[in-house]
């Protein structure tokens, strides 16, 4: 497949994600998908991950800022926003709704095989995300180092 075709698959996936169309994942994600970021395998566990995220952040949206493809890999940078209005499981701990709006930049790397996402990695600033939710706070020393964030 060409780089443009691979980018089109990723765009369709993010569009399906933003529209909460998990059924379309069946056409876009390999049954034996490997999710390195969340250490899981398989399409169904991948879909379950998103279903749980949608419960915690029903308005979560990812806007593509940049997308690059080479060979069978696609890199995409998204600006994600959402409001924590539902219960969300955070590392095995249930986090009740905070009502806080969050935003974060995320980079995904996907390997495409047979016109589907076959393998994926994710890079984001989880520390800042947790700070925005109010789950963690700076220490007094941290507040002095980063007063604009404290």
Predicted regions located by residue number:
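C-terminal and inter-domain tail/linker signature
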Residues: 1-150
């Amino acid at each position: 497949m060409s780089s443009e075709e691979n980018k089109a698959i990723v765009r369709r996936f993010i569009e399906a994600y933003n529209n909460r169309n998990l059924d379309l994942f069946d056409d876009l994600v390999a049954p034996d998908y490997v999710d390195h970021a969340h250490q899981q395998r398989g399409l169904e566990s991948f879909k379950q991950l998103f279903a749980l995220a949608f419960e915690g952040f029903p308005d979560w949206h990812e806007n593509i800022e940049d997308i690059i493809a080479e060979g069978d890999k696609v890199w995409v940078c998204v600006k994600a926003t959402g409001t924590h209005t539902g219960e969300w499981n955070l590392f095995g701990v249930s986090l009740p709704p905070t009502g806080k709006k969050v935003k974060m930049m995320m980079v995904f790397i996907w390997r495409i095989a047979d016109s589907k996402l076959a393998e994926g990695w994710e890079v984001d600033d989880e520390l800042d995300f947790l700070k925005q939710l109010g789950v963690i706070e700076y220490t007094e020393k941290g507040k002095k180092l980063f007063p604009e964030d404290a």
